[in-house]
Amino acid sequence: MRLSDITVLSVTFNNNLLTGLMLKSLAKQLGELPECLIIDNGTTLPADERLKDLVTLFDNRNQHVTGNYRQCSKNHCSTIDYALKRLIKTKWCLLVDNDVLFKPTLKKFLADLNDDEFDVCGEIGWDDAPPERLFPYFCLINVDKFKNENLNYFDNDRCIGPGSKEIGACGPNTKRWYKDTGCSFLEDIKDRWQIKLIKMSDVIIHKKSNGYGFTDEKTFLTVNKELYS
């Protein structure tokens, strides 16, 4: 797969440090910074304007472009949908969370991919609550196919409301979990797209998935400093 065919997409939310170091890690592991689209979904802290010198920065603060669904995951998901349909011009989108760091294996992984053999590439599972989803932490999506088939990445009518009691990887789903990013998309493509399954841990370290939670940012960045410095 050629880097020139890929746009890296990430949504930043009130955290310039993680977004900046994610991009720094990407450039270090690839030896260059490919086309990147960073969407600012912040509510209190604007994205660092200096990012405009390196990437395309799209201002969606307070969801003034995509609309506010009053739930963070819904806003995140609708923003990705907007970007896939209207902003990304390359054949492929590499969707990543802004709190990931890339491993040295990334460059060979992308170079070895034959993009004629799949339509989407990622890991399927469920972490916070059912149902299964294509994790948005690292996922390659064929944007041309997505547009040609008039698909959606976000469907507000298929979001889980409060009261679901299924048992998930994190225990009983007693909180107000909603169907998170990548669920309805997987439902729509699982029987018609070629899905290449991978282990994300082969190419990234994700702050949340690797046990650092939402708060232990300093430990995450210190332990994995060699991936971006």
Where do the protein language model's features map onto the residues?
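Short, acidic, metal-binding catalytic loop of nucleotide-sugar glycosyltransferases
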Residues: 24-33
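Conserved catalytic core of nucleotide-sugar-dependent glycosyltransferases
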Residues: 73, 102-183
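Short, charged/polar "capping" segments at the starts of alpha-helices
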Residues: 17-19, 43-49
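Short beta-strand/loop segment that forms part of the nucleotide-sugar
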Residues: 34-43, 59-60
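Active-site-proximal specificity loops/subdomain of glycosyltransferases
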Residues: 48-89
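N-proximal low-complexity "stem/linker" segments adjacent to membrane-targeting elements
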Residues: 1-24
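Short beta-strand-to-loop acidic/aromatic patch adjacent to the donor-nucleotide binding site
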Residues: 90-101
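C-terminal catalytic/acceptor-binding lobe
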Residues: 162-229
